[in-house]
């Protein structure tokens, strides 16, 4: 990957790394994508 909240220095961040946080919930990197997964609840 080159850009995205789950990408660092052209490498994927580890699964479980926080990529987006609000006062109510957090979203975590999957380790398989440079994008932050969107909660579908």
From Swiss-Prot:
<feature type="disulfide bond">
    <location>
        <begin position="6"/>
        <end position="29"/>
    </location>
</feature>
<feature type="disulfide bond">
    <location>
        <begin position="19"/>
        <end position="36"/>
    </location>
</feature>
<feature type="domain" description="Disintegrin">
    <location>
        <begin position="1"/>
        <end position="41"/>
    </location>
</feature>
<feature type="short sequence motif" description="Cell attachment site; atypical (KTS)">
    <location>
        <begin position="21"/>
        <end position="23"/>
    </location>
</feature>
<dbReference type="InterPro" id="IPR036436">
    <property type="entry name" value="Disintegrin_dom_sf"/>
</dbReference>
<keyword id="KW-0800">Toxin</keyword>
<feature type="disulfide bond">
    <location>
        <begin position="7"/>
        <end position="34"/>
    </location>
</feature>
<feature type="disulfide bond">
    <location>
        <begin position="1"/>
        <end position="10"/>
    </location>
</feature>
<comment type="function">
    <text>Potent and highly selective inhibitor of alpha-1/beta-1 (ITGA1/ITGB1) integrin binding to collagen I and IV. Is about 25-fold more potent than obtustatin inhibiting the binding of this integrin to collagen IV.</text>
</comment>
<dbReference type="GO" id="GO:0005576">
    <property type="term" value="C:extracellular region"/>
</dbReference>
<comment type="similarity">
    <text>Belongs to the disintegrin family. Short disintegrin subfamily.</text>
</comment>
<dbReference type="GO" id="GO:0090729">
    <property type="term" value="F:toxin activity"/>
</dbReference>
<keyword id="KW-0964">Secreted</keyword>
<keyword id="KW-1217">Cell adhesion impairing toxin</keyword>
<keyword id="KW-1015">Disulfide bond</keyword>
<protein>
    <recommendedName>
        <fullName>Disintegrin viperistatin</fullName>
    </recommendedName>
</protein>
<comment type="subunit">
    <text>Monomer.</text>
</comment>
<dbReference type="InterPro" id="IPR001762">
    <property type="entry name" value="Disintegrin_dom"/>
</dbReference>
């Amino acid at each position: 990957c080159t850009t995205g909240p789950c990408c660092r220095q052209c490498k994927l961040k580890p699964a479980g790394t926080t990529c987006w946080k609000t006062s109510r919930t957090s979203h975590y990197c999957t380790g398989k994508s440079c994008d932050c997964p969107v909660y579908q609840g």
